[in-house]
């Protein structure tokens, strides 16, 4: 088989796996699209107080995030027990059920009684699927990609996420222009979760054509199958020699099996969890989820909120695409460090714009530059580093812990952002700018941790990275 066809196979498998990331991003747009209709159909009929209604409305987002945490915690066991591909298949089923279930909840169960709880259950299933793909998609891609292309391919996870989000924003915009706003709020909104279910079906069908990874097959003793796949993925290499290297890594780790998660020391786990958590602690989802509110606080009209959100999605898409081209040229560590410093600068500028009530172009430019820097650094590079830095023998345990830390940081950031942004005492002084100044400080802290604890993995095989951690223990 020619090298071109082997490269085509690797690319095809990476693209199939990356659909999980597409669904990840698409669901964030679904969250934005269904907010008002859910309030109208499932909460307003209950005639609650404003505070109680707001709390109940928040359950929909919380249900997704709880599902994300649960999925990421289970993904390690699922990936080991059923394989990376098997776990992705399960996630695709979650997306299908979640999408069509949420779209049909009102028709099947009405709006009263337990209808909202049923709707939240389907949103929980969506989160479950997101939690699994956020771990197993980069793992799958890293284990089928050659070392010199691995960074670019794994960064496709973030590329897929931002593509999914942008696609969802545009789909929501098209829905709003297809009919009146009354039609969207009455029934048109159902197409947002239903479209997610359709993408889930495509994901499921394509996964049925994909094999599992050689690393997992070797782990399960299925060397013959691993050899056949390696011969297709790397026709220039000796598959038996590659299997021996993979198996040697597992065997060395088994000698330290009593140490479990910390078989290679605590530093590798701390570094991985830190990279995952700081991807959220820099404030990206506070900016993305609350962009309309942020722009209104800056003095922009509410009628431009959707277009501003799309502009953020476009910038994120463009610069994430650039990152996928340069991550293997400049390395992971420099992009993370300089990205942290760039985000810190932009958050500091934005916070000061709020603080000193500076409107116009400067705050808008700082937001878009922040998104651009994130898209070129922590957005995609986080997934590259997480997929590479953990030795194979502990990846099944360490990767879910890191991703769970990421989701917990996401919940923490969003909760505290709402508290701080609504605090009269803080706003009297900082005028909604306090949170952004905190994000600036956290960005600097994240960069310092990367500089001290995260190794450069560019150009190294997974076995070489494992040996590096073993020698440093």
UniProtKB/Swiss-Prot annotation:
- How is the protein disposed in the membrane? Multi-pass membrane protein
Compartments annotated for it: namely: Cell inner membrane
Q: Does the keyword Protein transport apply?
A: no
Q: Which CDD domains match?
A: MFS_XylE_like
Q: What Pfam families does the annotation carry?
A: Sugar_tr
Q: Enumerate the Periplasmic topological stretches.
A: 35-59, 107-112, 180-187, 279-303, 357-366, 418-429
Stretches that traverse the bilayer: 14-34, 60-80, 86-106, 113-133, 159-179, 188-208, 258-278, 304-324, 336-356, 367-387, 397-417, 430-450
Give me the Cytoplasmic side stretches, as residue ranges: 1-13, 81-85, 134-158, 209-257, 325-335, 388-396, 451-473
Query: What are the GO cellular component annotations?
Result: plasma membrane
Q: Which NCBIfam families match?
A: SP
What is known about what this protein does? Allows uptake of glucose by the cell; allows growth on glucose minimal medium by E.coli cells impaired in glucose transport. Also transports fructose, but has a strong preference for glucose.
**What family name appears in the similarity comment?**
Belongs to the major facilitator superfamily. Sugar transporter (TC 2.A.1.1) family.
Name of this protein: Glucose facilitated diffusion protein
Q: Which organism is it from?
A: Zymomonas mobilis subsp. mobilis (strain ATCC 31821 / ZM4 / CP4)
